[in-house]
Amino acid sequence: MTNFQDKPNIRIMFDSLAPTYDKINKILSLGLHLTWNHSFVSLLGRSDHLLDLCAGTGHVALSYIQKYPQASATLVDFSTKMLENVQECHPLAPFSYVISDVTSMPLPNDTFHLASMAYGLRNLSSPLEALKEVHRVLKPKGRLGILELTRPATYNPVHLLHKLYLNLVVPSVGRFYSGNSYAYSYLKESIRNLPCDTSLERVFHKSGLHIIRKRKLLFGTATIWILEK
């Protein structure tokens, strides 16, 4: 399996969302994504440098350097507008920027001890190829942390509430604040179409990355995996 689903031109979509992306996501998640980011950073552990993939507006990298002030980060994203947002809002942050798709990064082999990918896995058109590329740039025993929005299991008591939330709240709030209901309908569909854990973890294994830790957050509405090369 190399494609989770057919993707729209999400580069254009994310460029259009960049000015309001943080505000909308705070509202949509009731601020929980900030708590999840902190949990994610804690599980990533200490490193001098973080490779932040699908970096968006840089919240994970910012949380990381707040926890580890001596660290720096390389932010990779295919959305120019998202990375420009980080540069404008945080001009003094110890960041370098790479505008690139994760499937083909202009980075050398065996370079990074630690990489992160938050809320980006479900947007990859070729997840296996992207993870193989991450494997290429990680040093031996290097680690990749993945934080992703996921679906609670059908037997989970919050499954129905989560489904209603995705179907009704997410597109409505996105339309109200961004004027782009399609983008947040896409968010709903991207979560709904994300394969189950078993299928995802098979892709991880095929890429050469092996799970060393896994944590479910808020009844399975988000999941953290720590993978090792």
Curated annotation (Swiss-Prot):
<keyword id="KW-0489">Methyltransferase</keyword>
<dbReference type="GO" id="GO:0043770">
    <property type="term" value="F:demethylmenaquinone methyltransferase activity"/>
</dbReference>
<feature type="binding site">
    <location>
        <begin position="101"/>
        <end position="102"/>
    </location>
    <ligand>
        <name>S-adenosyl-L-methionine</name>
    </ligand>
</feature>
<comment type="function">
    <text>Methyltransferase required for the conversion of demethylmenaquinol (DMKH2) to menaquinol (MKH2).</text>
</comment>
<dbReference type="GO" id="GO:0032259">
    <property type="term" value="P:methylation"/>
</dbReference>
<keyword id="KW-0949">S-adenosyl-L-methionine</keyword>
<protein>
    <recommendedName>
        <fullName>Demethylmenaquinone methyltransferase</fullName>
        <ecNumber>2.1.1.163</ecNumber>
    </recommendedName>
</protein>
<comment type="pathway">
    <text>Quinol/quinone metabolism; menaquinone biosynthesis; menaquinol from 1,4-dihydroxy-2-naphthoate: step 2/2.</text>
</comment>
<dbReference type="InterPro" id="IPR023576">
    <property type="entry name" value="UbiE/COQ5_MeTrFase_CS"/>
</dbReference>
<keyword id="KW-0808">Transferase</keyword>
<dbReference type="GO" id="GO:0009234">
    <property type="term" value="P:menaquinone biosynthetic process"/>
</dbReference>
<dbReference type="InterPro" id="IPR029063">
    <property type="entry name" value="SAM-dependent_MTases_sf"/>
</dbReference>
<dbReference type="InterPro" id="IPR004033">
    <property type="entry name" value="UbiE/COQ5_MeTrFase"/>
</dbReference>
<keyword id="KW-0474">Menaquinone biosynthesis</keyword>
<feature type="binding site">
    <location>
        <position position="57"/>
    </location>
    <ligand>
        <name>S-adenosyl-L-methionine</name>
    </ligand>
</feature>
<comment type="similarity">
    <text>Belongs to the class I-like SAM-binding methyltransferase superfamily. MenG/UbiE family.</text>
</comment>
<dbReference type="Pfam" id="PF01209">
    <property type="entry name" value="Ubie_methyltran"/>
</dbReference>
<feature type="binding site">
    <location>
        <position position="77"/>
    </location>
    <ligand>
        <name>S-adenosyl-L-methionine</name>
    </ligand>
</feature>
